[in-house]
Every structure is written in C-alpha cells, then in structure tokens.
Curated annotation (Swiss-Prot):
HAMAP family: 23SrRNA_methyltr_H (MF_00658). The gene is rlmH. This is Ribosomal RNA large subunit methyltransferase H. One of its GO terms (molecular function) is rRNA (pseudouridine-N3-)-methyltransferase activity. Homodimer. It comes from Pseudoalteromonas atlantica (strain T6c / ATCC BAA-1087). It comes from the Bacteria.
Amino acid sequence: MRIQLIAVGSKMPSWVEQGYQQYVKRFPSDMPLSLTEIPAGKRGKNADIKRILHKEGELTMAAIPKGNRIVTLEVTGKPWDTPMLASNMQKWQMDGRDVSLLIGGPEGLAPECIAASEQKWSLSPLTLPHPLVRIIVAESLYRAWSVNTNHPYHRE
C-alpha cells in the first residue's frame, strides 16, 4: 500500500522538509509515504476565495490516482488516537487500495474534496499551521505503522 499526502501549499521552510523527511525515510519500502504539493492560490485583499478554493480543489482531485481511498484532514472529522489510526491503516491495507490523505490550504479543503472523502480525520480541534500538519501526519502514520508491526518506536 502506498500512502500519498496531498497538501495545498509549496515552498515550505527547510525545517518542514527536514522534519517531514525524518519520518518518510523510516517507512518500509512496501508502504512508502509520498508528498504531492498543490500550489496555493494567491490570496490578497480582494482575492476571490471561493474561486481560489475551487481551483485548489480541482488540482487536488486531479492529483489523486484513480481508485485511491480518499481521507481528508479537517477539523470536522473524527479524532483518531494512535490505536484507531493503526486500526484504520490495517483496514486500508486489507482493502488493497492506495491511500491519498488531503490537507487543505488556509481556508481548508474545497467542497468537492470533502464530498469525495471516504473518511474524515481531525488531528485536533485547534487550528494548526499547515506546514506543521505535514510533519504531524507523517509522524502519526509512522507511529501507527510501528504499532501494527510491533516495532519498538511506539511505547504505551
């Protein structure tokens, strides 16, 4: 199973890339984690946010390989603790499909992304900086993998 993180935004600070890569390189070859960046629309004083969100949504949906399970990360989703994420990962593996996890931009995800989602995951009721979410998701997925494989990374 391949896991694809699709995130709105590019040109992240180096600490984001370094933090994200710390976890990517730990994943086994039979479960690689990849990142697809979607350019964020220009936002300014007179920006048409609905149009920007729609364009980001189109680009996000186009980046999802056909047949992938779609999981959106959003504040209205269900909070998952580590055992729940590990359980979901096992179900995803048994499903036999690859997984695309979607992270929206400053205004969140486009309605078409949310509508296509099979699962909605809330990392926190807090508003988190989008660059930090990439690292948190990568670490959480690695931790869940370690639970499922009895790897010593996770400790109860």
